[in-house]
UniProtKB/Swiss-Prot annotation:
NCBIfam families: GSH_gloB
Alphabetized GO MF terms: hydroxyacylglutathione hydrolase activity; metal ion binding
Catalytic reactions of this protein: an S-(2-hydroxyacyl)glutathione + H2O = a 2-hydroxy carboxylate + glutathione + H(+)
Enzyme Commission designation: 3.1.2.6
Database matches in CDD domains: hydroxyacylglutathione_hydrolase_MBL-fold (cd07723)
Cofactor(s) for this UniProt protein: Zn(2+)
Co-factor binding details: Binds 2 Zn(2+) ions per subunit.
Lineage: Bacteria, Pseudomonadati, Pseudomonadota, Alphaproteobacteria, Hyphomicrobiales
Assembly behavior: Monomer.
Example of a GO biological process term: methylglyoxal catabolic process to D-lactate via S-lactoyl-glutathione
Protein name per Swiss-Prot or TrEMBL: Hydroxyacylglutathione hydrolase
Entry keyword Metal-binding: yes
Length: 260
């Protein structure tokens, strides 16, 4: 007897100025979750557009532009808010805490929690292996990574190592539409990368048409994102770090991005 893999429906939209709102929906159980809650009104509009109701919020980290809609959405829909244990006191309305290695179910889908600190001390990513998708908050961006507000370069490097270990065909959904500016920086670090140059041109076309640049994929990020290319000989040579540890190469790239 053949089994049919479950299908996850994903509704992605830009809200606030550059935040991504992301709703995930399991049609068989009719459950819907919001990845973070940047803007309650925008999320409500997306739910109405799709004819869904909201059951969960999966919080990646405590920053206001990711949790500001929590209380309004909880009041309207009675949602259960899940978020990182390490940031429990900073997440409005939180009902359930999770930590690295935890696993829970969302309808027919397994959700694996990956601790990805660096941007904040307790940030987590949510990986749905059956849907081949990972939701990385402000840890991994398209062609970038999050600023280190509460972590060190080594902390973020170790978090990114966890994400690049996922299958290459895993779709990547992140918290912000920063891709065009990230591409400009990436080209200063890896100017000979033909895949990056092609991607940067495509990103420019998409943004000129006011279209979204996500989702990406783990494979695409590994091929073009300088923050994941600490091993590349050309990048190392350009930075003067030919023999440096991988984490030192990453730290130098992050330092340069902070000054870009």
């Amino acid at each position: 007897m053949n089994s049919i893999a479950p299908r996850l429906e994903i509704e992605q939209f830009i809200c606030r100025s550059d935040n991504y709102g992301v709703l995930i929906h399991d049609p068989q159980s009719a459950l819907t979750a919001s990845i973070d809650a940047p803007d309650a009104a925008a999320i409500e509009a997306a739910l109405k557009r799709r004819g869904w109701t909201l059951d969960f919020i999966f919080t990646t980290h405590h920053h206001l532009d990711h949790v500001e809609g929590n209380e309004a959405l909880k009041a309207k829909y009675g949602v259960s808010i899940i978020g990182p244990k390490a940031e429990e006191t900073k997440i409005p309305g939180i009902d359930r805490t999770v930590k690295d290695g935890d696993e829970f179910t969302f309808g027919l889908f397994r959700v694996k929690v990956i601790a990805t600190p660096g941007h904040t001390a307790g940030e987590v990513s949510y990986y749905l292996p059956d849907a081949k998708a990972v939701f990385t908050g402000d840890t991994l961006f398209a062609l970038g990574c999050g600023r280190l507000f509460e972590g060190t370069p080594l902390t973020m490097f170790q978090s990114l190592q966890k994400l690049v270990a996922l299958p290459g065909d895993t779709a990547v959904y992140c918290g912000h539409e920063y891709t065009e500016s990230n591409a400009r920086f990436a080209l200063t670090i890896d100017p000979a990368n033909s895949a990056l140059k092609e991607r940067a041109a495509e990103i420019a076309r998409l943004r000129a048409a006011d279209r979204m640049t996500l989702p990406s994929s783990i494979a695409l990020e590994m091929a073009t994102n300088p923050f994941l290319r600490w091993h590349d000989a050309g990048i190392r040579s350009r930075l003067g770090l030919q023999d440096a540890p991988d984490e030192a190469v990453f730290a130098e790239i992050r330092k340069r991005k902070d000054m870009f």
